[in-house]
Amino acid sequence: MTRLLHAFRRGRWTPSLDTAPLPGRAGDRLALVPEIVAAADRRRWDGLAPGLPPAPDRRRELLLDALDLFEHGTLDVGGLGPQSGAEFRDALWESAGIPGPLAERWCGMLRTTLEARPEPSPDRALALVSLPGNTFTCLETVLEQVERSAAVWVRPSRREPLSAARLVAALLAAGWPPERVSLYPTAQPVLRGLIRLTDRHVVYGGSALAAAVRTPAGLTLHGPGRACALVPAGMATAAAADWLLPLIAADSGRFCSNVRTVLTAGPAEPLARALAAALDTIDPRTTDSTWPLTAFREPGAAERATRSVAERMRPGDRLLTRRPPVVVTGGDTYATPHLVLTGDQPPGAPEHPLLGHEVPFPFAAVARATAPAAEALAARSLFVFRPWSAAAVRRDPR
């Protein structure tokens, strides 16, 4: 039986005649909110907000309760009915290919990030958070805006809306006022309209979205991270490979902070071969892997993602990982980790199309680079990793 995941607006779960299919084998669908409906909701909010009771004072305590419910509770998620924590993880696997160990890890990261962040001063803004589909850890921004704003509109990814819907249900169950949160699944063109309709906006997306969305006041755009790692001359090959492996493979390569580019001051091939051998040990058929991989649920998506690497390779570049680019096991489709050693173009040339290329699986390109070339690429990266130090944020994503 096909189910419809509802929107949440005007204080209640709401179906829609405008729907889109959810990825996965269940055949479920997602209710979409047209821009004209969102515009009417903004007008309603402007008239309603002055007369609402104040938002809860102890927001941090409420958010921590909501995270407990998000992770473990049985919640009424609109259109899907009561959903336990275990059923949520099963649904993530079936629809988005997110394995249980990653879901557990990401839930823990949400709590850690919330507890570490200073409590903001609340204001009267209507905030928008437009989420990506690669990881639900970006729900930390929803929590941040709930703690800060008068109300929050959440626009989930159509590829993975389940986590956003469950967080809205958890907020409601923890006592957050229903008029102060909304879930607006929309078609992509409606995003611009949602930005116009709200006061503060946090938008996640890749390079195409970053180019398409204008930058009005109040917009924070989280685009490509272009994360890179700089390996100094003299660092032992085995030590460098051990250091780099988790930077590339953790979280199935889905974070904007996962390293995609490795620039080494020493010979590149020994390091690239050692790293490729380590990546080849990541087997999607192994359920207890240290580095679990996500499965691809959209037909052809894994092939498109891996092809985007092959199409950017230049003469002289070599793919050193040996597994097939895409494997199917138990009916599940995976993109296997990729490691490319760039050829004899200018060392570490920042214009090489593979340097900084982001895909939703573990991938990195290794190049030898002079110090000036490495620093030139690092200046274009949001995350720069050096041995024995934390990631450095090199530029403001705004």
Indicate where each model-derived feature is located.
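ALDH superfamily catalytic-core signature
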Residues: A173-P177, D199-R200, L209-G348
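A short, well-structured beta->alpha microelement
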Residues: C107-G108, T112, R180, A369-A373
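Short glycine-enriched loop/turn motifs at secondary-structure junctions
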Residues: R25-R29, L194-R196, G223-G225, F255-N258, ...
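Rossmann-like NAD(P) dinucleotide-binding subdomain of oxidoreductase/dehydrogenase enzymes
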Residues: T112-A249
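Conserved C-terminal structural/oligomerization subdomain of aldehyde/semialdehyde dehydrogenase
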Residues: P21-A38, R42, G47, P54-D68, ...
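N-terminal Rossmann-like NAD(P)+-binding subdomain of aldehyde/semialdehyde dehydrogenases
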Residues: M1-P122
